[in-house]
């Protein structure tokens, strides 16, 4: 019996020894990569049959509780379309606490792979749904809200990721969120933690090129997502053309379901640090601005929901000099434009007009054309400019604006627009536009006009055809510089433009000019002007309108022009109660009249007055008339200054006559040494091409200094080479 027990004991010992050896061999065999690969291939072959889809793993290396290393992982969907093709996957494990619903991973590396995600055109089903269906539990599982995953490091290198919703059409330009393709995708992230629906991570590097052409050089940020929303901190986004810093971007929610109603429920709380943004990068996400490719520099705070988004303390720079500081409240763009409410404020701005003209606009949009007359402003410096209301009823005000033309301020005005046109008027019944040191002459290219200071109010309407109507225009001009004189206290009243007719009143109460006038001007191409002026007093020398000293003028003037064009026009002027005083002499005329007629090259001018009558008729060639006459008079009187020997003849061919009436006071003022009897007559003709000037003089009496002549009869004809007469 003892022997039997010894034999049995020995046999059991030998069996245990071999069993231990077998266990040791088995353990080492399982840890061998080729064994693990063989097992994996058998498992994937079985899985392929179960899924009716190709699943392959090229090589496996697993160390229990240490790491999992997979190579050449490939998965197809049942339609034989690739879902995953991965060259290398490495998973470094740290702790796996099944009972505590916690998984801690040291490292996850994905290298050289392609991931294809699609949604079916028929029902929107994802192409990986067959995997979810196979591995899902038959009965509802316990909530995973307490499951926690910690991943110390995630690296993705040289990856390709695509997403296509086959139910949606593809956009021709820009990032299409229904058809995404990320090439050369590289990602490095640390401190990744998920618990339930929450996620936190530190993005160290994110790079890719999207199929649209948008290229991301790098993105760094601290990110978190939960039921309370999405939060990015200390984000830095870089593209080849843009560098954007976002210290804070929070999309706040009460529930993750709020993202399904993004415009109304998700609240923005963001700060954009001073950043360089290339508009071409923005165009990939807003195709409407495609073609805009310049850099802008901006910073600011973004608040509230998208339906009432506020951009506070916005700083915007573009071009060489333009800078804008503003507070903006964007409207709800989902509403019809008539119900979109604007409330915008430019606190400070320097706008360079050349920067505006050089701005690249979206494709198909004409470049900004700055009107020639406005280009003279060069720039605008604005302070506290405000705009509020709807597109059809806007209120605009500008506390202060300065340009190369001068300064202006604009009290609140109302701009109403409808299908029939636009109407602009002041909110209050008072002047709303003030101009200071305004270079009116520079604006109008009239060098004789200088600065203007004044205040204006008006109501302006522009209909759909571009017709302009001005109502109730009034202005109080503190000063207007004209012809080297600064006129003060000018008033414009009851001015209007209607049916292309301008009607208005002008009143001047300057120390050297007191007058009132009524104007009626046709703004069309055909001249039609009517002007009535009552000049109570005008100190002409002080106004730089006369070289004499202390001369004064007064009259009631009626002036008009009428005709289909300036080449066929009739004009008249009447001066009643004309008084002109210089030194101790005065001229008075109860009525003086001038009639003017022009038809093509033919002109006729008639002047009649108690002082003298004058008539000229024919082809005048006004632009060269003076030089023409001086040339011919120099033949008879060579000392005439300005005469030239070489001369090009004009078309001038006219007759003229002058008859004196009561000229004594006129001569006392301008030629005090000359006396000319009444009924003195000067008449003649001039033909430039024939080089012929005829002058005839009939004078009862003429006295000059100590000389005195009576019964004078004089006739002279001047040719190009001689003069004769009697």
Regions found by a protein language model. Give the residues of each.
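Flexible beta-edge/linker motif
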Residues: 32, 58-125, 133-166, 181-204, ...
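N-terminal type II signal-anchor transmembrane helix
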Residues: 1-51
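Tryptophan-anchored aromatic micro-motifs
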Residues: 151-159, 474, 535, 575, ...
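Hydrophobic residues on conserved beta-strands that form the core of alpha/beta folds
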Residues: 57, 70, 86, 105, ...
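Amphipathic hydrophobic-ligand
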Residues: 79-93, 168-187, 211-222, 228-229, ...
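Transmembrane beta-strand segments that form the barrel wall of outer-membrane beta-barrel proteins
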Residues: 203-206, 230-236, 308-316, 393-401, ...
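Gram-negative outer-membrane beta-barrel proteins
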Residues: 114-118, 162-167, 209, 276-280, ...
């Amino acid at each position: 019996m003892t022997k039997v027990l010894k034999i049995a004991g020995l046999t059991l010992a030998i069996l245990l020894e071999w069993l231990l050896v077998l266990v040791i061999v088995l353990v080492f065999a399982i840890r061998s990569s080729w064994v693990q690969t063989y097992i994996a291939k058998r498992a994937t072959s079985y899985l392929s049959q179960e899924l009716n889809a190709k699943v392959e793993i090229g090589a496996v290396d697993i160390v229990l509780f240490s790491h999992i290393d997979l190579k050449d992982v490939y998965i197809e969907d049942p339609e034989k379309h690739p879902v995953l093709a991965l060259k290398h996957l490495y998973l470094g494990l740290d702790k796996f606490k099944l009972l505590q619903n916690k998984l801690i991973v040291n490292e996850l590396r994905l290298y050289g792979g392609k991931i294809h995600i699609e949604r079916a055109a028929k029902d929107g089903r994802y192409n990986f749904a067959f995997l979810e269906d196979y591995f899902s539990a038959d009965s509802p599982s316990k909530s995973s809200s307490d499951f926690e995953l910690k991943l110390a490091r995630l690296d993705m290198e040289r990856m390709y990721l695509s997403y296509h919703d086959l139910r949606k059409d593809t956009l021709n330009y820009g990032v299409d969120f229904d058809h995404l393709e990320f090439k050369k995708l590289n990602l490095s992230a640390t401190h990744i933690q998920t618990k339930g629906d929450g996620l936190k991570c530190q993005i160290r590097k994110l790079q890719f090129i999207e199929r649209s052409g948008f290229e991301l050089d790098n993105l760094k940020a601290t990110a978190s997502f939960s039921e309370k929303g999405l939060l990015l901190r200390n984000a830095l986004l870089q593209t080849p053309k843009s560098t954007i810093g976002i210290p804070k971007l929070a999309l706040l929610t009460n529930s993750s379901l709020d993202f399904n109603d993004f415009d109304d429920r998700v609240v923005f709380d963001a700060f954009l640090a001073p950043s360089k943004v290339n508009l071409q990068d923005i165009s990939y996400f807003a195709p409407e601005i495609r073609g805009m490719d310049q850099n802008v520099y901006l910073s600011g705070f973004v608040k509230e929901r998208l339906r009432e988004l506020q951009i506070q303390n916005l700083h915007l720079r573009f071009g060489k000099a333009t800078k804008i500081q503003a507070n903006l409240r964007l409207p709800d763009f989902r509403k019809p434009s008539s119900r979109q409410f604007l409330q915008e404020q430019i606190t400070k701005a320097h706008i360079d007009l050349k920067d505006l003209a050089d701005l690249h606009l979206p494709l198909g949009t004409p470049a900004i054309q700055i009107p020639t007359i406005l280009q003279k402003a060069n720039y605008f410096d604005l302070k506290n400019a405000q705009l509020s209301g709807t597109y059809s009823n806007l209120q605009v005000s500008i506390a202060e604006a300065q340009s190369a033309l001068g300064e202006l301020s604009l009290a609140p005005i109302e701009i109403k627009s409808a299908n029939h046109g636009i109407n602009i008027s002041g909110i209050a019944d008072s002047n709303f536009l003030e101009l200071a040191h305004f270079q009116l002459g520079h604006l109008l290219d009239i060098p004789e006009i200088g600065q203007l200071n004044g205040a204006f109010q008006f109501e302006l309407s522009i209909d759909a055809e571009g017709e302009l109507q001005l109502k109730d225009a009034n202005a109080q001009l503190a000063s207007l510089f004209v012809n080297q004189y600064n006129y003060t206290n000018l008033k414009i009243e009851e001015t209007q433009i209607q049916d292309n007719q301008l009607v208005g009143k002008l009143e001047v109460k300057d120390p050297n000019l007191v007058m009132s006038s009524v104007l009626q001007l046709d703004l069309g191409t055909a001249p039609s002007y009517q002007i009535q002026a009552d000049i109570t007093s005008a100190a002409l020398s002080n106004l730089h309108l006369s070289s004499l000293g202390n001369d004064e003028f007064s009259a009631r003037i009626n002036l008009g022009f009428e005709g289909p064009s300036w080449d066929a026009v009739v004009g008249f002027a009447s001066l009643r109660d004309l008084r002109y005083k210089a030194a101790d002499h005065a001229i008075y005329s109860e009525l003086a009249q001038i009639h003017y007629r022009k038809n093509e090259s033919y002109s006729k001018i008639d002047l009649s007055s108690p002082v003298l009558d004058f008539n000229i008729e024919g082809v005048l060639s006004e632009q060269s008339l003076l030089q023409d006459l001086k040339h011919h008079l120099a033949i008879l009187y060579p000392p005439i200054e300005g005469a030239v020997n070489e001369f090009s003849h004009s078309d001038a061919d006219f007759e003229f006559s002058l008859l004196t009436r009561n000229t004594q006071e006129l001569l006392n003022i301008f030629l005090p040494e000359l006396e000319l009897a009444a009924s003195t007559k000067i008449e003649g003709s001039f033909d430039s091409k024939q080089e012929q000037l005829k002058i005839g003089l009939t004078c009862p009496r003429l006295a000059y200094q100590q000389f005195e002549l009576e019964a004078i009869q004089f006739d002279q004809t001047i040719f190009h080479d001689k003069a004769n007469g009697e």
